Amino acid sequence: MNTKAGSRLEKVLKAGEFAVTVEVGPPRGPNAGAIIDKARLLSGVADGYNVTDNQTAVVRMSSIAASKILLDEGLEPVMQMVCRDRNRIAMQSDLLGASAFGIRNVLCLSGDHQKASASGKLKGHPGAKNVYDIDSIQLVSMVAGMRDRAVQEGGDPLTEPTPFWIGAAWTPLAPPTDFRVFRLAKKVQAGADFIQTQAIFDLRAFAHAMQQAVDLGITEKTFILGGVIVPKSAAMLRYMQRNVPGVVVPDALIDRMSQAKDPLQEGVAITLELIAGLRAIPGVKGLHLQAIEAEHLLPEILQAAGLLPRPMGI
């Protein structure tokens, strides 16, 4: 098997297996034990473990440090990098450091606006200056250049290439929806090897978006992993429906959660239905599963979905 980075995630996808990634959020402090506990809880349930980069613009342990802790625990991180907080010089420096640590998967993102950090009880940093020296498409291109040609974004050579399996995000149901597939195509053209979608709750709408991607030949050039967030309450679904761009939550799903005697178990049931639906959509090659502050549910869900054990010998 010819590989670009040699990561487990790359090998699983190229072997034709249905890949699984899950999310591990770093703590809002320096306690490595918080990451180690999650690593031990989730060991063996996925092919890659997304490590967020100051998600929702809330200050957390760096994605590089948390990714290294996962590596030390025997898990394969998918290190997220956002354009919000660094210019291209700092990004490339961090990418070199990540490569030196042995991190082999990088997910290139724009990053949540800093105003999102002031929510609930958190004051956040809504007045922080965003950077956006480059956008997420340019970030994909820059990482691809460092890997494929061993060059910096400015054209200067690197002493060695950085072997990364490069990921990007797709929000297929954000308006204008017909435009989104073309933005996806630009990311793939820039060098995105795999794609993780925003959370999907409307399978019919997502199937239409996937058909557009199939028709444009995108699914022949990259691997698309459908995103699923485990809903824990009707309030959580209602919040995402109203406040998370590109997340379409049918009213019927909110009503179902509202009427459930045990909302958490109903959320697990909904998650299993969504996973089964995603697997039936042509072009979907994997699952990106999130259980926000409920990671203990992931092994149970993946077992019930028939996605455990993960492929061996890869």
Predicted regions and their residues:
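Active-site pocket-lining/capping segments in soluble small-molecule metabolic enzymes
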Residues: 130-159, 169, 173-174, 216-276, ...
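Active-site mouth loops of central-metabolism enzymes
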Residues: 19-34, 55, 77-89, 164-179, ...
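Active-site-adjacent beta->alpha loops and helix N-cap segments on the catalytic face
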Residues: 2-3, 7-10, 31-33, 57-69, ...
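Catalytic beta/alpha-barrel core
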Residues: 49-59, 81-82, 108-109, 194-202, ...
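Short, well-ordered coil/turn segments that N-cap beta-strands
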Residues: 15-20, 45-48, 73-77, 102-104, ...
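Conserved, mostly hydrophobic/aromatic
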Residues: 23, 49, 98, 187, ...
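Conserved N-terminal beta1-alpha1 strand-loop-helix module at the mouth
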Residues: 1-48
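Glycine-rich anion/phosphate-binding loops
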Residues: 83-101
